[in-house]
């Protein structure tokens, strides 16, 4: 590990010189590339330097204890040695985590698709609750939200809703949300007070660039139709809604919330590219899953990942057996505690697999 860290530090020093070179600065494309590489290496190099400083302090304290006869100095050296030795193991763990292969999608924006599943109107209402939860979470992290497509029920819920969250590290934190979310609560229409169970499915897709997914225009069928509101009521007198079908895979995306046909087509293609990219990722994850059993990070859409129990005010994540009793705050976007726990388990699994 130390040899690898030395190489990374040398690379970091080299990049530090390059980004200050006037000739490199003049070539903005190359300069931006070096700036990103430098920024990516900085956390691990800073942590390595802190680790080296701690090891140096330990060495100095041991030398004092071997050579010094003054009791006061020896006592200070003992205290320093104990303090520094306590830091070694935690620093080594932090360095191991920083050395883990980085998910190339982690810094990307995300497209989130939520669909009401089993449970009719209750499932649609829960899909609306999840949409609000992720919207509030994005606000807490000062990320931007852009609605891409929505099919509402007219009673406060969604059959399905797609939206983009833009912000640094959005995918790194939200990628663990893909799967089936289950809700247990008493519907307002339930006179007998019985608890009903409903589900909604969440898909979190990294936004992709055109260079990452190429779509042959001949593989697309594009239909235009009139936008409609609740119950089929027309909300637009022009054929501005767009349905894009990817013929080879059968993927269908409809968008009608944009102000123009062009905008709806752009949104639909954006979602389609993200879905196709996500399918390719899923195939890769299958290969990885065959090598190691993973609790989190598989992103399997059919996997029941979490239960929201309203009578008990609890949220239980079934992948890591974590239960929190703060349902109201959680649905208001206070979900970092759960996400941090999922990240920790994921990192631990990856370290074990190395």
Swiss-Prot record:
The record's comment on protein family reads: Belongs to the prokaryotic/mitochondrial release factor family.
Q: Name one GO cellular component term.
A: cytoplasm
Annotated organism of origin? Clostridioides difficile (strain 630)
Q: What is this protein called?
A: Peptide chain release factor 1
Q: Which GO terms describe its molecular function?
A: translation release factor activity, codon specific
Give UniProt keywords alphabetically: Cytoplasm, Methylation, Protein biosynthesis
Q: Which domain of life is it from?
A: Bacteria
Q: Where in the cell is it found?
A: Cytoplasm
Q: What does this protein do?
A: Peptide chain release factor 1 directs the termination of translation in response to the peptide chain termination codons UAG and UAA.
């Amino acid at each position: 590990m130390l040899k690898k860290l030395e190489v990374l530090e040398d690379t970091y020093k080299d990049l530090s010189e390059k980004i200050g070179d006037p000739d490199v600065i003049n070539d903005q494309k190359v300069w931006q590339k070096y700036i990103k590489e430098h920024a990516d290496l900085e956390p691990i190099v800073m942590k390595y330097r802190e680790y080296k400083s701690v090891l140096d302090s330990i060495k100095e304290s041991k030398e004092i204890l071997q050579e010094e006869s003054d009791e006061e100095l020896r006592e200070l050296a003992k205290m320093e040695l104990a303090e520094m030795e306590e830091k070694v193991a935690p620093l080594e763990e932090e360095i191991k985590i920083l050395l883990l292969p980085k998910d190339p999608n982690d810094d990307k924006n995300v497209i989130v698709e939520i669909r009401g599943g089993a449970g009719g109107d209750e499932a649609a209402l829960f899909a609306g609750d999840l949409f609000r939860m992720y919207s509030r979470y994005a606000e807490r992290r000062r990320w931007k939200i852009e609605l891409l497509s929505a099919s509402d029920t007219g009673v406060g819920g969604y059959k399905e809703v797609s939206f983009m969250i833009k912000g640094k590290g959005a995918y790194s934190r939200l990628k663990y949300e893909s799967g089936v979310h289950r809700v247990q609560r008493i519907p307002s229409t339930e006179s007998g007070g019985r608890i009903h169970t409903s589900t909604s499915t969440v898909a979190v897709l990294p936004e992709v660039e055109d260079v990452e997914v190429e779509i042959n225009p001949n593989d697309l069928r594009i239909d235009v139709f009139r936008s409609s509101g609740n119950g089929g009521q027309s909300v637009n007198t022009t054929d501005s809604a767009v349905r894009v079908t990817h013929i080879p895979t059968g993927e269908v995306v409809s968008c009608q919330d944009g102000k123009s046909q062009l905008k709806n087509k752009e949104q639909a293609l954006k979602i389609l590219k993200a879905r196709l990219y996500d399918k390719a990722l899923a195939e890769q994850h299958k290969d990885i899953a065959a090598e190691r059993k993973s609790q989190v990070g598989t992103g399997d859409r059919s996997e029941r990942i979490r239960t929201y129990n309203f009578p008990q005010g609890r949220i239980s994540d079934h992948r890591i057996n974590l239960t929190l009793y703060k349902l109201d705050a959680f649905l208001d976007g206070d979900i970092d505690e759960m996400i941090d726990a999922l990240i920790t388990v994921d990192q631990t699994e990856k370290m074990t697999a190395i």
